[in-house]
């Protein structure tokens, strides 16, 4: 029974990235249609409700994704620079300045960018959650601002992440 549960958890973790990509894409693409300030309006549209509740789901998935990627010492791959282990990151940046494209994996530039992306995803979700919890108060407006700031940074990450994924695929095809 325990083995089956572990197996199902591993399977869930494999699909977590896909689920986050799909939900994030939907949330980002529909966000221009969202009209909320201090609280969910009385005449809220389907898009408003979808954004709020799918955002809450995405927040939970983002937290699970971050935890899963930080377990068993894997956090050092994404955040090694926090403990002074930035040699590969430094080499990647120096190589990039010299026109050499960094390799994917390890503790280099790509992994550091992915780590920052995970933090931005969770920050976007948590700021949205806090905005939701404080709706109807003056504090909600403040958290709306934080949510928008983190969301814009996360969108920037998505663009960079997509470009890096495409470059990785092109590099893979060349070899």
Identify the meaning behind each predicted range:
Residues 1-175:
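Membrane-embedded alpha-helical bundles that constitute the cytochrome b-like, heme-associated redox core
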